[in-house]
């Protein structure tokens, strides 16, 4: 019997304050140590803020990426974010067991808050 590496299941949920919500893949499975990519497509606009949060069962959400690609200092370097056109991507390079969680994408239209 061949050895199969354990899989992590990363679930994506979204939140948005714009009228047309983003679309996304509902779940991603990845083997330990492999790269995981979670993408969202939405009607982002200049001046909007895009954030990614990680939430584990029974815990509060933790900001892992802000302004599309910036990472808080306490977040491991394996987490990164990127944006191309209207697609925003969260990448986990070398996924670890502790990365199994729900991931939330948030798009905030800065014009709506002024």
Curated annotation (Swiss-Prot):
Residues 20-40, 50-66 are annotated as: Framework-2. Residues 67-69 are annotated as: Complementarity-determining-2. Keywords: Adaptive immunity, Cell membrane, Glycoprotein, Immunity, Immunoglobulin, Immunoglobulin domain, Membrane, Secreted, Signal. Residues 20-114 form the Ig-like domain. Residues 41-49 are annotated as: Complementarity-determining-1. Residues 106-114 are annotated as: Complementarity-determining-3. Its main location: secreted. Gene3D superfamilies: Immunoglobulins. GO terms for cellular component: extracellular region; immunoglobulin complex; plasma membrane. One of its GO terms (biological process) is immune response. Residues 1-19 form the signal peptide. It holds the Pfam family V-set. SUPFAM superfamilies: Immunoglobulin (SSF48726). Residues 70-105 are annotated as: Framework-3. It is found in: Secreted; Cell membrane. Glycans are attached at residue 86. InterPro entries: Ig-like_dom (IPR007110), Ig-like_dom_sf (IPR036179), Ig-like_fold (IPR013783), Ig_V-set (IPR013106), IgV_Light_Chain (IPR050150). Most probably, the immunoglobulin is not assembled due to incorrect folding of light chain. Immunoglobulins are composed of two identical heavy chains and two identical light chains; disulfide-linked. Probable non-functional open reading frame (ORF) of V region of the variable domain of immunoglobulin light chains. Non-functional ORF generally cannot participate in the synthesis of a productive immunoglobulin chain due to altered V-(D)-J or switch recombination and/or splicing site (at mRNA level) and/or conserved amino acid change (protein level). Immunoglobulins, also known as antibodies, are membrane-bound or secreted glycoproteins produced by B lymphocytes. This is Probable non-functional immunoglobulin lambda variable 3-32. It comes from Homo sapiens. The lineage of its organism: Eukaryota, Metazoa, Chordata, Craniata, Vertebrata. The gene is IGLV3-32.
